[in-house]
Amino acid sequence: PNKIPSRASWKVGMQLGDKLIERYIEDEGKIPQNIAMLIYGGETMKTNGDDIAEALYLMGVRPIWLNNGDRVIGLEVIPYEELKRPRIDVTLRITGLFRDTFPILIRLLEEAVNLVSQLDEPEEINYIRKNMNEEIEELLKEGYQLSEAEHISKMRVFGCPPGTYGAGVGVLINSKEWETREDLGKAYINWSSHAYGSSYHGTKVEKIFTKRMAKSEITVKNESSVEIDMLESDDYYTYHGGLVAAVKCASGKDPRSYSANASDPESTKIKSLKEETAKIMRSRILNPKWFEGLKRHGYKGAQEVSFMVDIFFGWDATSEIAEDWMYDKITEKYIENEENREWIKENNPHAVMKSF
């Protein structure tokens, strides 16, 4: 953990950060002030910290390495003259695995926030300081002591309750005990509003987390591989889709939501969730070769079709990123096509009923 982020991942993280900012400017015509980012423990292990590097870079902070190695011994502020853009406020939603595995990185991220908050810079180039000053003022009016208000205003790392895992959304969708996106957003906020840092471990701060969500203009999740996509695991929609629903619930509007890919460290790519969904739909879900490959696996292959439909629906329920043509094409290929439907029914009757 003390070799994260590595020098190599720092380069990738800077590239991811620059491309995220560029894409948002392209979409909205302005630089983002507040970003909500997902951090997975497994991805952190695989990449040696691409996500951590990006978060630090967005805040305008970089690692200090020992001599020529990758051992991180501290952080330093990137001067504004070198950064050439404002310091962006980043809220991090970590997974349970990350919480358990990387407490040292939680403290590193906390240190980054502390460094930036102490800078004598105008608020228009330091959005972390801007948000903290506003929040401290609000908390003082609510009766908090100054030291406590300052402490709360620096909270940026959040996750599920200690000893638990997940995002609270998947269970709700599968149980059908929900009616609106707001229900899903509230569930995500309730499950994710536990702050982590050097002096607190899972403290429930739902009001504070809701404020962070309300200000978030962007949600982003990075990938380091092309071997799995966002329609292959329910983790994707429960964590990222749930995050989108939480921002919508807290702010009343949808954030710009992106999926970045750093499988080629020399050429990272970023797409909106809608663009990524459309790409997966055309390249895999509707590709005859995919279904033919599933047929070799009988019962399990038919189950994969049903699982795909569940995940697709989960994304639409949380993020409303599906388009009508996608539902039409899935129905046409797997339900209305008699040959395909009968194969699924023969190999796994429960799968075809669930898809219906």
Whereabouts are the PLM-identified features?
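Ligand/cofactor-recognition surfaces for anionic moieties
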Residues: 1-356
